Amino acid sequence: MGKQIALLRAVNVGKRQVPMGRLKELMGAAGFLEVATYLQSGNVFFADGGRSAAENGGRLEELLLEEFGFVVEVVMRSSAQLDGVIAANPLPGRVADARRYVVTFFGRAPEAGVVAGLRAEDFEPDEFAFLGDELYSWSPNGVHTSKFTPQFLSRRLGVQVATARNWNTVLKLRELAG
């Protein structure tokens, strides 16, 4: 069995509270195997149970809605896909300050024409690169000043689900996914 990583969008901010301990219990009771979490920002690992990422992601979204009463969008990646995200890093010189280097994970890849339009814009001093279902961005003045928020990217790119993790978290997710 392979490992899958569920990246929950916008949890544990404001009234959208999803205690990771409770989520782990719920997932175990629902038949998810080898469930573990990292941080309170919605990072969950589990054995795929012979099911696709889409199937497990859908099951998890249903479980979250039933238990917590609000929609939580989930972006799924396999441990092999996360390996690819790390290996393909298009801005390797920017990882020295990993808190300012972010990977935004999309539920599906944005359309090429929309990506080209965004590439034509000037976001200096920020730098960014698209690869597949991810956008890598470096914000030298800090991520809090960056325009590359999941909300901005979802709106501009027409991609409904996007969630971001800094490079330190991406590396830790891969380590923990085994």
Which sequence ranges carry the predicted segments?
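Surface-exposed, charge/polar-rich loops and edge strands
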Residues: G2-G178
